[in-house]
Amino acid sequence: MDVYRIRISVFFLLVLLTFAALTTATNIPRRQLSNKKYKGPCRAENAIDKCWRCDPNWAENRQKMADCALGFGSNAIGGKLGRIYVVTDNSDDDVVDPKPGTLRYGVIQKEPLWIIFGKNMKIKLSRELIVTSNKTIDGRGFNVHIQNGAGIKIQSASNIIISNLRIHNIVPTPGGLLRESEDHVGLRGSDEGDGISIFSSHDIWIDHISMSRATDGLIDAVAASTNITISNCHFTDHEKVMLFGANDHYVLDKDMKITLAYNHFGKRLDQRMPRCRFGFFHLVNNDYTHWERYAIGGSSGATIISQGNRFIAEDELLVKEVTYREKLTASVAEWMKWTWISDGDDMENGATFTPSGDQNLLDKIDHLNLIKPEPSSKVGILTKFSGALSCVKGRPC
């Protein structure tokens, strides 16, 4: 009898262990094993990264990257036609007369510049960083943090590329005198604590940025900003992630066109991934693994095309829906006219997407500069290397 009981006990122990293993496998973090640090040979998994990442000579030909943008921001060349400017000083003590060698000194120059960094840096901006036209901020090769101070402001500018930075813990900073360009000092009000703020600007490409914990938005684009691509970025730990269009009265935002491609919207995000007004927004092959209220929201007739994305809903039954329409400004009859399309998206853990408007629009917009979506089953691979990269000179990135 004792032997029989031992055998029964062992049997049930094995059953429990097997069940625990299966449960653990089912509840592996949402990015699963793909989020572990990769140590193998270079793998460029999406169309943008394939353009430059696995070239071991990327550091000798940095400006090749300017040919790699896709989507609505594909014409952004940044400082491709200019010289290299090296940031050697991480200070930001004088915002009216910034020192040569600082990041602030580089971004206000009249000439096109490809701005790189001479070492690992943690930069605390005393005031918002005003980036003028024809500039690239290229953090490849070093770990560059913009942290614990103001964020980046792109205002009335064009041809901007921002790549491979870690932007986090951004806070509002007070108003006052600030050099806005090489030959102009302006009196500015306080800022809101955005990570990157785009105001009345065009031809912008933001790529491979790791962002978390700003005060207002991580990335906001307003005041008729257009022709923007945000790609290969990793977002975590924030409430209101992206705002495209500041209010429901600024109708000039109808010309806004923004591409989101190959981004990972990760842990502890709440809403606005993005929140859109008026314009045309193409969301392609992004990985939405967390949202607490909603993922994609909008109003004022925004057109939203979601293609080949992966949406993994939270377990909470009340937040399975991906989309949110601002019902205070529109009746059901009105928002049902807004064209929101889900095409080839992967809906997991009960996620739902409520479509509306012209579901045949994709057949009518071949002339637009849209990234061709890959199957949503590949999203985990396409976004595997999202966020700032750890690039080493002389090796594939």
UniProtKB/Swiss-Prot annotation:
The EC number(s) given in the record are 4.2.2.2
**One MF term in the entry's GO annotations:** pectate lyase activity
Similarity field: Belongs to the polysaccharide lyase 1 family.
In terms of SUPFAM superfamilies, this protein maps to:
Pectin lyase-like
The note on cofactor binding and number reads: Binds 1 Ca(2+) ion. Required for its activity.
Name the chain's protein. Pectate lyase
Pathways involved? Glycan metabolism; pectin degradation; 2-dehydro-3-deoxy-D-gluconate from pectin: step 2/5
Q: Which residues form the active site?
A: R272
Give the signal peptide range. 1-25
What residues does Ca(2+) bind to? Answer: D191, D216, D220
Tell me the InterPro entries matching this sequence: AmbAllergen, Pec_lyase, Pectin_lyas_fold, Pectin_lyase_fold/virulence, PEL
Which residue positions carry a glycan here?
N134, N227
Biological process, per Gene Ontology: pectin catabolic process
The reaction(s) catalysed by this protein are: Eliminative cleavage of (1->4)-alpha-D-galacturonan to give oligosaccharides with 4-deoxy-alpha-D-galact-4-enuronosyl groups at their non-reducing ends
Which species is listed as the source?
Nicotiana tabacum (Common tobacco)
Top-level lineage group:
Eukaryota
The UniProt keywords, alphabetically, are: Calcium, Glycoprotein, Lyase, Metal-binding, Signal
- Cofactor section: Ca(2+)
Q: Which SMART domains match?
A: Amb_all
Q: What class of enzyme is it?
A: lyase
